[in-house]
Amino acid sequence: HFSRLSTLRGLPEVRDVRGAGHMWGLEFAGAGARDGAAVACEVASRCFAAGLLVLQADNLIRINPPLVASDSEIEFVVETLCAAVRETLAAS
């Protein structure tokens, strides 16, 4: 699942995608008038609207799915996060 998140690395405002086990993080860089923190905040808001809670701190988003999460739940996390990032960057 982490390899799917890694595909976000090529996007212009995604500075880094990193993770170990079930702890993953995305770091955002600013572009134009928006700084990385604003991008991360918008991504977190889109995730929340879709039913996914993520931790946003400054320009970072951290995801910690439970170790007992099913494959379908992990798939939901990855799909929702990827969609939120792509929608946020497309709107800028």
Give, region by region, the residue ranges found by the protein language model.
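Conserved N-terminal phosphate-binding loop of PLP-dependent enzymes in the Aspartate aminotransferase
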Residues: H1-S92
